[in-house]
Amino acid sequence: RLLDASVEIVAEVGWEALSMTAVSKRSGVPRQSIYKEVGTKADLGRAVVDREVGRFLALAGEELAAHPDLETGLAAAVRRVLEVGRANPVLQAVLRPGHDAGLLTLLTVDPDALLGQVTDAVMALLGDQASVAMVDTVVRLMISHLVQSTVPVEDAVMRISRVAAAFG
């Protein structure tokens, strides 16, 4: 309930306007309980990011499982993540012009908050099919296309697939 309420608030008014009081009212959980359960606003932000990352990883995992061929699986996973990401309310709120960079900082400054977590998870999904260097590169490119999309999804998928193929 807390994370759902937080996501709704972030999508409506942005991270900077989120307060524990607003989360308490929206979720029906007493404010003191939120502090005991979650901690600070930054801790809540990390929990929101972790949950959203988990959702993206689940989508990628579904595509990799449905497409056992590494090249096809990676392309399908990247496509699905980019398509869903472009409509994700948390990501859109964080990337909205004029936003407070607090939540974006969690995504970009702390490498373990996103990059390390995603790279490790994708490596676990792929096993020995791919090198750490290839997965790290694909994840970095995918995150870049999520955060600063300048081309259509299909173009991004094609570019990322070409880079992945270069790892052989």
Language-model features: where?
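Phosphate/oxyanion-binding loops and surfaces in catalytic or ligand/nucleic-acid-binding neighborhoods
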Residues: 84-88, 145-148
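Short, hydrophobic secondary-structure boundary micro-motifs
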Residues: 19, 90-96, 154-155
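Helix-turn-helix
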Residues: 1, 5, 9-43, 47
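Amphipathic alpha-helical packing segments from all-alpha helical-bundle domains
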Residues: 57, 89, 93, 101-136
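Amphipathic alpha-helical segments that line or abut small-molecule/effector binding pockets
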Residues: 4, 54, 71-86, 136, ...
